[in-house]
Amino acid sequence: MYSAYVQSLLYNVLFDDHRFAEPGALSFDHWSFFWGGEPKHFPYDQNSLNEHLYWQMVRSGYVGIACEPSCIFQICNHPAILGFRMHDVLTGGSRAEEVVTGYEQAWRDFGRLDPGGHYNMMVSGDTRAVRPNALKAPWVDAWCGSLMNMWNRDFVCQHYPRQLAEILVPGEDGALSVVFPPPMEAMGRQVVNDTCDFGWVAVWASEIGDADTLTGLLTHASTTSPGTGRTSPNRWSPRSPTPST
């Protein structure tokens, strides 16, 4: 998934710049003193990276590419699909169409939605067990819906109103906030982290074109968090007590 985010930033499409088509232009270096061993260098360019991600999709049966070991999140494969679409624009190919057809069938078999109508979070690559969004975490629906909207808009818009209604909290003066789900438990411990629920719901509303919801969310942000820049009033930081200079 992380490589797919890089793949989707094809400069040829965005800026008419071919720098990342050069061999080795997209190279990844990895070394950790915790594990020992020599540093590893992975040289790619936009074409070889596209090829690498494509074959990972094929080998998985089009379920997707695991972004953590054996964890194939439904969310995390939409950047790859976007990258395939942009690569097809450059090459005249049809790889995105093939991948989407296989991906749709694979997730139709597993179930794109859980019994509660929320997006299933992930499939385990080894056991093929489906993990639902049992806690109704806003980030799961919002992140998945935001990214899937660029190629599967009718499906996303069909389920958006009901999914959204379960996570919004109305406030004063039209403000809208987002419910805070209970912490996830893993191996007997509670995991508390910032999953960016509010931010992803704002992105989701923006991608859908839901101006009323987006305005309500931005109203909440304006009244609870100070701005971080004089030239960018719509950037907020809840940890900054005063505006940044």
Model-derived regions: residue spans:
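Non-transmembrane alpha-helical segments in soluble domains
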Residues: 4, 54, 104, 145, ...
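Extracellular low-complexity, Gly/Ser/Thr-rich intrinsically disordered linkers
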Residues: 196-227
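Well-ordered alpha-helical scaffold segments within catalytic/enzyme domains
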Residues: 2-22, 26-36, 79-92, 143-154, ...
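Extended ligand-binding clefts on enzyme/binding-domain cores
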Residues: 33-44, 48, 59-63, 67-196
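Long, hydrophobic/aromatic-enriched structural stretches that serve as scaffold segments
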Residues: 5-13, 47-61
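C-terminal capping/lid segments that line or modulate ligand- or cofactor-binding pockets
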Residues: 142, 243-245
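Conserved blade-ending motifs and adjacent loop-strand segments that build the rim/top face
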Residues: 221-243
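Amphipathic alpha-helical segments of tetratricopeptide repeats
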Residues: 12, 105-108, 222-226
